Amino acid sequence: MLIYNLFPLLAGPFGDWEPHFKRAADMGFDWIFVNPVQKPGYSGSLYSIVDYFQLNPLLVDPESKLTLEQQLKATLAQAGKLGLKVMVDLVINHCAFDSELTRQHPEWFVQENGNIAHPFCMEDGHKVVWGDLVQFNHPHTSDQEGLYRYCYKIVEYLLDLGFKGFRCDAAYQIPGRIWGRLIREIRQKYPDTLFTAETLGCTADQTKQTAQAGFRLRVQQFQVVGFPRLLVAGAISVSARNCSVH
């Protein structure tokens, strides 16, 4: 399994993706991984999604008479004709701070002192806050079923557009039982769907949790190869341990 990473904003509108698909196929890749294609929030970050059921307007082909969703479906169909399958980033650990979800379902999010909190990380002993993000509280929300059903609808929406799999962003931050149910129920309807888990920066126990949840691959890192703007995702089996990715 060889994965070619196509970054949407570098590739341009959906109608411009076919030459990249052809180049990837000619180099022997069989999967294309694209970063998030849904509508981003005020920061513009592709990983800060404001609306999961709208596509990024920057990817519209102004010369096309098709809707944006139709353009994407046609583009993914072109990949299939070249023998390629396309996976997309599934970002359900967090969303954009300016998403309507924060007002419609505040109980879905991690809160601090009665307010929805921004996620953060520690870097060199300093707290780095992602001010454009809010984190879903998958383990402890009072409406776990509602949040789960919403995530299921996101996956189904992306599959109906023509994607064949997912690179699940920050997968280790979502409980394995939730992933296990989601993967199982999606595969009941879409049996060939590929789920890969991002495990970069997580502990060994967290990696084990993703393996037990039903992920077929874990994506540990990206490696830049000797071509401008081409990124190859290093993916290894979840059953492998203490392996370096090349």
What are these regions (language model features)?
Residues P40, H94, F166, I174, ...:
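Glycine-rich nucleotide phosphate-binding loop and flanking beta-alpha elements
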Residues L2-L6, I32-V34, V86-V88, F166, ...:
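Hydrophobic faces of well-ordered beta-strands that scaffold small-molecule active sites
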Residues L161-R167:
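Conserved, well-ordered alpha-helix/loop/beta-strand core segments that scaffold catalytic motifs
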Residues L76, K153-E156, D169-H246:
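Active-site-proximal helices and loops of the catalytic beta/alpha 8
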Residues M1-P13, E18-P19, R23, M27-F29, ...:
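Substrate-binding/active-site clefts of carbohydrate-active enzymes
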